Amino acid sequence: MRALVGVALDPHAEGTAQETMRTSVSDVTGRCLDETISHFNLQVEREKLYESVSGHVERLALQTRALPYFRNTLQESLRSRSPFLYDVAVYLADRLSRALGITFSDDEIGLLAIYLGLYSRPVNADDHAVSAVVICPRYQTLRDWLLAGLVEHFGNRLQIVDLVSTKEEADEQDCDLVISTTDESSRTHPCVQISALLSDLDFSAVDAALLRAAKAKSRARIAESVRRFLDPELFFTGVAPKGSDEAIGFMCDALEEKGIVPPEFRDSVLLRETYSPTAFARRFAVPHAMDFLAHRTKVAVLIPDSPIGWESADISLVLMLAINGDDYDDFILFYQPLISLLYDSRLYSEIRKVRTFEEFMNFLDNELSETE
């Protein structure tokens, strides 16, 4: 404030005052980014991310730039394709708003999501890698050749956990796939047989095996998440809330009565809605708290008797997310395919017909595993 008064009294001080403000804004932005990165357990290209976000926030703080070209053209795409990153951007916008008094529109939040997408990723981004044991005769030169060739060709898609010489040794390992250069095949794990020459045909065979193994791994992980995060006592039909606030209140009450969330959860959900309403595709909503307040991670489900007015949308399905921070890395692996499924108009029409928890579970178990 003192710097701004100085500018008013001495116009020649404007350059110095703006530079002082830029430094202050940059420092605050750095602290908000630090908190966001820690909160969501991100890996980042620190220098590039900090430079991009700081520059953008400085322009907002100094009001030297308008963004008419970004008027909501990418918001829905960002929310549908990268709901995790969009939530990270909302969290960052909240921290920056509290610290700097800047108001962030949906457009500005979308721009933050773009920067985050360019220069960060979740810590568990490599969880899709397929773990493999290679069966190969005990010739060190041959083993070195195989290892180098497989790693170079498949990179982060393949995690080789061991090289063994017999199928019995491979069967004892905990892995997703066995790659065998001998006539022996594993009886315990999926197995692909290749030659030690690593020809184009061999690479094609391993590539196909990796795709199958990754899909099986994804299906098992999602099935486990469905069982873990859904609860029959938090599945509601035959209810007709009059609006979004009533629907949020109803679901928060249910979560609080089961001891899953504390009383302050409700206010955090409503705060999140003020930044960017959680209605997707004008047909379903995914309200959730700004912070990880839940004692346990659960998803409450509401299929109302009639559509609920949610901002400018009519919502026919509500999924309220109660997330515990310890579960977040696992939860986002379930969250992204769930949102993708609900954006499919055919599948969404089918899920609206569901009336029991068992039907809902079976539907998700069958369909979510096909979305990745």
Residue ranges and their predicted role:
Residues M1-Y335, I339-E372:
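A cross-family "folded-core" feature that marks the main globular domain of proteins
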